[in-house]
C-alpha cells in the first residue's frame, strides 16, 4: 500500500489543512468526489471550490492515502481511506500501513 514511501512524501501529502479535513470526512466511509465536496462545504467554514476538492483527492490518492474505485451501480468513482493508520520508521525513514 504505502511501500517504501518516505517521510517527506507523507509530510507533504498531510501538510494541507484541506487534505486533513478530507481524510476526516472519508474516515466516516467511502464517498464520491461530489459527496466529499458537499460534505466539506457543509461541515467546515473554509469553503472550497469543487476543483480544489477534486485536486486534493487526487493528491491523497497519488500519495496512497486513498483508494479509488468505480461503482458500477451508481456509475461514479468513490474514494476511501487506504488504511486507518500509518507507521513511520524513524530509522529507515519509511512509512507503512498500520495494523
Question: For each predicted feature, which ranges?
Answer:
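Short amphipathic alpha-helical interaction segments
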Residues: 46-62
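Short, cationic-aromatic polyanion-contact patches
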Residues: 15-16, 71-92
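Short acidic DE-rich linear segments
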Residues: 92-99
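Short alpha-helical segments that sit at the start of domains
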Residues: 1-24
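A short, conserved structural fragment
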Residues: 61-71
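DNA-recognition alpha helix
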Residues: 34-45
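Short capping segments at the starts of secondary-structure elements
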Residues: 17, 25-35
Amino acid at each position: 500500500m504505502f511501500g517504501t514511501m518516505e517521510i517527506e512524501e507523507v509530510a507533504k501529502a498531510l501538510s494541507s489543512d484541506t487534505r486533513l479535513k478530507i481524510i476526516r470526512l472519508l474516515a466516516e466511509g467511502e464517498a464520491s468526489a461530489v459527496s466529499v465536496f458537499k460534505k466539506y462545504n457543509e461541515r467546515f467554514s473554509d469553503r472550497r471550490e469543487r476543483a480544489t476538492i477534486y485536486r486534493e483527492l487526487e493528491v491523497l490518492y497519488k500519495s496512497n492515502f486513498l483508494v479509488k474505485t468505480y461503482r458500477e451501480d451508481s456509475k461514479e468513482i468513490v474514494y476511501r481511506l487506504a488504511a486507518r493508520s500509518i507507521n513511520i520508521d524513524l530509522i529507515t525513514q519509511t512509512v507503512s500501513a498500520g495494523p
